[in-house]
Amino acid sequence: MRARALLPALLCALVLALPSSAAAAERPAPPNDPYYGEQWALRSEATNGIDLLETWRFGQGSGVVVAVLDTGITTHQEFDGRVLPGYDFISDAVRAGDGDGRDSDPSDPGDWVSTTDISAQTYGPNCTETSDSSWHGTHVAGTILAAANNGVGVAGVAPLAPLLPVRVIGHCGGSVTDLIDAMRWAGGLSLPGVPENPTPATIINISLVVERSCSAAMQAAVDELSARGVVIVTAVGNESLDASRFAPANCFGTLTVGATTLAGDRASYSNYGSAVDLSAPGGAATRSGGILSTYNEGRTAPTGSAYGTASGTSMAAPHASGILAAVLAAEPDLPRSDLFTLLFANLAPFPAGSSCAQTPGLCGGGIINGARLYAAFAARTAPLLTQSAPTELAIGASAPVSATVDGSAAALTLTTPTICSYSGGSVTAIASGSCILQATRPGSATVQPVDLRITITVPGNVPTLSLTLPARLKVSRRITPTVSTSSDGVATVTSRTPKVCVVGANGRLRAIASGTCKVRVELPATAQFAARRITVSVRATR
């Protein structure tokens, strides 16, 4: 069985209770990317977009690794600095087109099919249509995470998210086995014969389908990845058929995405039915109605970076992946079940009169929308926090410390073991500094997350400090000041009156003119003692 990528025609062109970050962020200004105005899918719900600017109130996906399982990617300025080491899982060297089979190079060498290839059946008897290279993976990746506010091109939905490119589609398709292996590796599962993935993905975007049931091996991969908290976002296919006929969209536990047009209705090509969870902008097969994203100028092999439009459920899925990356950047520990509860309860309704609105279940529960999702996150109940702790504690002293979250005892964790110890509900000061205890709790569908911190100041012991000088000091005479202290810090002796006296590099004091010589000795703070300084005066005479 051969997997088919969704390849439409592309057109060139103290106690601190930290609130949920979703509860306080402001709506950002539009980005300065020159093609942003042409990205209709990023506009507000009023024009059937995802509302990018409201999505960015969550953040822009920083730290949330997004794997794109696709044709690989080409070098593009919109990805600079955020491409992680990926992998090429195409086992068929001929189909891979890069000289070998599986390897650590996930770049896209092009997937064109020529007349000669068809005549010679280079890629098998089922490959019967000529095509230029699709640059499909590059386009999908750009929708998710193209850089924003860099003054060029387009803006991605999660422009700070790291990109994990994983190549599974070559000339005229790919294999289900390669796809399953790629899914497992991308999410951090072990795979014999393949190096361990050092940067597992939190979100896996799969913009490809194969017409078949979800195999036991594929379902097992989805189950294991879901258990690790990996979100698998899949396109539902472009055949205008029941989506339940296509894997991996028919695997239980994937988030399946159908396509809508600028009018907010089901795109004519989009698969449909009960296997569709939600919809997102996928565009119509026209330049003005398509999805504008990153592309490449080459018709066969890659040449220069470019931008182009495409349409398909392949283009819809990455809008959902980008929104989820933004959400999980704000709340990485949010249980995925709560994430989906909030997501499905806050989809934008399909426009009145559309086929999706008239036939419930045809296109999923609604259109994914960042504004509605953000509002739901921000409206969650803030937890009630209480605490009992001293504000200051002397070295060697102990005191009870406790905290509650919504009336239940909070499990406090010590984060500064060199400053204090914590056991049995009591903290003991060890050294000067800030003693910090912390309690965290993930958010849920109804309650904001907790990040409670208790800070106790531990001052150092006040050291004794004296500086012995003679009553008078003759001009040009040199003496060594005598410093006495109980501190284990190293004292520094300096002159406060350099026109009257100076302290040399060897620590000796010398009077250079008549007058009052002021000498300062300073001690730094140490683990046991506080900082201290004193100034002593001596009369310099001739």
Spans of model-derived segments:
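Bacterial N-terminal signal peptides
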Residues: 8-19
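Sec/Tat signal peptide C-region and signal peptidase I cleavage site
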Residues: 20-24
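Active-site core segment of subtilase-fold serine proteases
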Residues: 26-162, 171-174, 178-185, 189-200, ...
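Structural recognition of the beta-strand scaffold that forms the well-ordered cores
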Residues: 65-69, 85-88, 139-143, 155-156, ...
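Acidic glycine-/aspartate-rich tracts in secreted/extracellular proteins
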Residues: 71-75, 79, 148-150, 169-172, ...
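Extracellular S/T/G-rich loop segment that most often corresponds to the catalytic His/Ser-adjacent loop
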Residues: 92, 230, 246-329, 333, ...
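C-terminal subdomain of the subtilisin-like protease fold in secreted/lumenal serine endopeptidases
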Residues: 184-188, 193-208, 214-221, 228-230, ...
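Solvent-exposed beta-strand/loop surfaces, strongest in extracytoplasmic domains of secreted
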Residues: 379-542
